């Protein structure tokens, strides 16, 4: 019996649309990362991008549990001395909720060229409208 190795040109990709309104950020992001990687398919191969496309709606209404909304900080560094910039998740969700969700998913994907390729299949929208109707996405309900 031979092991199956997926090839890039043989992968059948689907489009999914997920509404994250009221869902915890980390739980939603982990399930989205699994779909983007293709780990939900029996044809998963670690070194090949076998994942599907995901459209996220209502990113501004994602939930953070406990006191994380006020206490947890979103940090990045400008690479200059003293260049650590930080903003609370409350302010970040008000100004750029798409970035907050995308960043949570990015940190759950592989760090490298394959991970960047997987992240390009993620489309995040602030409201409940998106412009990918031509792809006929399936509505996907998150497990928790």
UniProtKB/Swiss-Prot annotation:
Entry annotated with the keyword Transit peptide: no
CDD domains: Ribosomal_L13
GO aspect biological process, one term: translation
Gene Ontology MF annotations: mRNA binding; structural constituent of ribosome
Domain of life: Bacteria
Cellular component annotations (GO), alphabetically ordered: cytosolic large ribosomal subunit
UniProt keywords, alphabetically: Ribonucleoprotein, Ribosomal protein
Subunit structure: Part of the 50S ribosomal subunit.
Entry-linked HAMAP family: Ribosomal_uL13 (MF_01366)
Family per record: Belongs to the universal ribosomal protein uL13 family.
Function description: This protein is one of the early assembly proteins of the 50S ribosomal subunit, although it is not seen to bind rRNA by itself. It is important during the early stages of 50S assembly.
Protein's name according to its UniProt entry: Large ribosomal subunit protein uL13
Organism: Clostridium novyi (strain NT)
Originating gene: rplM
